Amino acid sequence: MNWAYDGTELVQRIVQWALRNDGVRAVLLTSSRANPNAPMDALSDYDVSLYVADTAPFVARGAWLADFGTVLVRFNDERDGDGMREYSRLVLYEDGTKVDFTIVPAEFLRKIAKTPNLPDYLDIGYRVLVDKDHLTDSLLPPAYRAHIPHRPTEAEFRALVEEFWWESTYVAKNLWRDELMPARYNLDSVMRYDLLRRMLEWYVEAGRGWSWKPGVFGRGLKSALPPETWSALEGTFADASIDANWHALFQMTALFRQVAGNVAMHLSYEYPQGMDTGVTRYLEKIRQME
């Protein structure tokens, strides 16, 4: 497998392919490989936006994807955004290269160039690889501010805390019933990756002036958090035994209590300790039930 970081050869192939294809009017490289401040390694994707005269030929036929290598697996997606449909072709090639192609009508790029703010996917970083019609001449430079969490209002902070403690009751109920699957769904997907992750990001942001850009699903938290906080987070992961998951639940609530209390202090908000205490007693009562 080719684990080259800079992808110079692949980028050159994409550029030459676009120059030969009259239907492709502009090509932009976006995301981490176009952001000088973003972490990048051998497994970083290539995010390539193709601005085309007509999307139909590129959407209906996928043979063009093989122009950049032997396709190992691919995934197609499409969505509406800003009144225009865009299409994704996510491709993993046999040499280990992963490219996320986005196919967009060229007129959309002209529209973006006239707006006062870049969309998030361009604000995180972009490089113009091809521009046959000068569509990007007026495009704003990236500010690299997209996806940085904003300072929550007190209502937003309170809502997240309430949801965390509410979800903990589902975990307790399902652990008592010996229902591991729903218990782990609430513990991992909801409490950890949705709620605790966001509180941990707020914790980091509060100490960095709301300027740190987290990665998806908590990427980057290990290096951003104090070692003891990361160690406490590791303690919230459990094996498949019910007892281990009870332990993980209480480890998670203890960590959340500590981090949320710290965030509340930084923001001069009130942490609802009474609710915390009451729900914790409820969880302990469920655990002790016969």
Predicted features and spans:
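Metal-dependent nucleotidyltransferase catalytic core
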Residues: M1-D22, T30-L43, S49-I112
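Conserved NTP/Mg2+-binding pocket subregion across the NTase superfamily
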Residues: W3, D67-P182, L187-D188, Q288
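Short amphipathic alpha-helical segments, especially helix-boundary/capping motifs
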Residues: L10-Q12, V24, P142-I148, L233-E234
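Surface-exposed loop/turn and secondary-structure junction residues enriched for glycine/proline
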Residues: V27, Y46, K132-D133, Y203, ...
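Short, charged helix-to-loop "capping" segments that act as catalytic/coupling loops
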Residues: S31-A42, D120, Y126, D133-L139, ...
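Conserved nucleotidyltransferase catalytic core and NTase-mimicking acidic/glycine-rich helix/loop elements
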Residues: H147-E290
